[in-house]
């Protein structure tokens, strides 16, 4: 067991239950775990010593919502959207066609590159989804690929999103027969979660229930895309199924907020203990890219609901892995404090993946996921938006950047 002392930390944001922010601090890492946290002057000896020279350190980002398995380019579609023009050649179908045509090696190379970009920006725990295959064979291929990358430690959580969209030329109910039958059977050993896009133009409440029920029966956890396009049944279905998270949440009724808040009655936010409810996943980069209303993170937090921030990296509506950007946006545009935004991008994401006992905060015994900023304090994430502030990253105890 080899130990490393990371010291000379100007500001250490722990996101622990006390919300401690330490100054002149140090962390000791043993193998892949945190072994000690405290004042630098009291730090124990270690095999190796790394000085961060007066920089700030916080937990690595937990990106709880991404779509990394894709090929193709949709920049013309984005340009048209920014100009307020229609673009008939766009949409998920474009990505599906390009992704189906790509070889396994090509897709693996693309995913590796996107993960590398994410880690270079401070992300240390990643969820990603299938959903650009939309046939039994392709969804199974993408799930196998992601499971292999998970074994390598490149991604951490794999989600089955066969119910992303009804493919062109398919009847919705006929397609769902595939999703809950042979498609689910082919991916269940590779995925930990089932997801559905429950919204206008995708799947309605009953269709969503059908997929989620099948996923639960197959042993998968539940997450959901909901209430992105308009206020609808997504949040209600997520609560009904005890989903770990419902993501997008741009359009919420008072009843939606009340329902989400009701799932958190067994959770004590101050001590970060108890039974977590359904996390409200906010995706600000996507909201900006689609010129949608920003998700009401302030309203959700004030109602007692845990919120996550995630990149939603995908080729159509949020082609970025930058969690720094999302955190800065949450402070500048969504009325979160820095502490709230950092918590949402770390512990909030971990709660939405039910991984809060392993990651999401800097505490003894947790995975050593550290993000060192090229700045003396974490507020620089919002104070200096768009700047390349990631200086170093430890992921599971190993220096990754």
From Swiss-Prot:
Main location as per UniProt: cytoplasm
Residues involved in N-formimidoyl-L-glutamate binding: 132, 314, 316
Catalyzed reaction equations: 4-imidazolone-5-propanoate + H2O = N-formimidoyl-L-glutamate
EC number: 3.5.2.7
Pathway: Amino-acid degradation; L-histidine degradation into L-glutamate; N-formimidoyl-L-glutamate from L-histidine: step 3/3
Broad enzyme group: hydrolase
Highest taxon listed in the record's lineage: Bacteria
Residues annotated to bind Zn(2+): 65, 67, 225
GO BP term, pick one: L-histidine catabolic process to glutamate and formate
Record's subcellular location: Cytoplasm
Any one GO MF annotation of this record: iron ion binding
Tagged with keyword Cytoplasm: yes
Cofactor binding note of this UniProt entry: Binds 1 zinc or iron ion per subunit.
GO cellular component: cytoplasm
Binding site for 4-imidazolone-5-propanoate: 74, 132, 164, 228, 317
Similarity comment: Belongs to the metallo-dependent hydrolases superfamily. HutI family.
Protein name: Imidazolonepropionase
Organism of origin: Micrococcus luteus (strain ATCC 4698 / DSM 20030 / JCM 1464 / CCM 169 / CCUG 5858 / IAM 1056 / NBRC 3333 / NCIMB 9278 / NCTC 2665 / VKM Ac-2230)
């Amino acid at each position: 067991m080899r130990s490393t002392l990371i010291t000379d930390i100007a500001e250490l944001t722990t996101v622990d239950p006390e919300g401690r922010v330490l100054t002149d601090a140090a962390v000791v890492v043993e193998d892949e775990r945190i072994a000690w946290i405290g004042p630098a002057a009291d730090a124990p000896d270690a095999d190796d010593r790394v000085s961060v020279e007066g920089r700030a350190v916080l937990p690595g980002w937990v990106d709880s919502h991404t779509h990394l398995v894709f090929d193709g380019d949709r920049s013309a579609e984005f340009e048209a959207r920014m100009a307020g023009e229609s673009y008939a050649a766009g949409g998920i179908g474009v990505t599906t066609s390009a992704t189906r045509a790509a070889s396994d090696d090509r897709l693996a190379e693309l995913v590796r590159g996107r993960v590398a970009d994410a880690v270079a920006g401070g992300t240390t725990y990643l969820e990603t989804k299938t959903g650009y295959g939309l046939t039994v064979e392709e969804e199974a291929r993408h799930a196998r690929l992601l499971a292999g990358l998970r074994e390598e430690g490149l991604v951490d959580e794999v989600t089955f999103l066969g119910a992303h969209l009804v493919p062109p030329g398919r009847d919705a109910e006929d397609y769902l027969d595939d999703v809950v039958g042979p498609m689910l059977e082919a991916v269940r050993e590779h995925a930990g979660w089932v997801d559905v896009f429950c919204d206008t133009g995708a799947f309605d409440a009953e269709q969503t229930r059908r997929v989620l029920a099948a996923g639960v029966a197959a042993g998968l956890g539940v997450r959901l895309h909901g209430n992105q396009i308009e206020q609808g049944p997504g949040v209600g279905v997520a609560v009904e199924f005890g989903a770990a998270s419902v993501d997008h949440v741009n359009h919420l009724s008072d009843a939606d907020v009340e329902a989400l808040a009701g799932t958190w009655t067994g959770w004590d936010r101050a001590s970060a203990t108890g039974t977590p409810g359904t996390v409200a996943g906010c995706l600000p980069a996507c909201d900006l890219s689609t010129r949608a209303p920003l998700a009401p993170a302030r309203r959700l937090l004030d109602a007692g609901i845990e919120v996550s921030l995630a990149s939603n990296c995908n080729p159509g509506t949020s082609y970025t892995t930058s969690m720094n950007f999302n955190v800065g946006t949450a402070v500048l545009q969504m009325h979160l404090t820095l502490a709230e935004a950092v918590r949402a991008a770390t512990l909030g994401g971990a709660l939405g993946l039910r991984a809060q006992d392993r990651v999401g905060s800097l505490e003894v015994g947790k995975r050593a996921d550290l993000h060192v900023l090229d700045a003396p304090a974490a507020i620089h994430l919002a104070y200096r938006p768009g700047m390349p502030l990631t200086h170093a990253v430890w992921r599971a105890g190993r220096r990754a950047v």
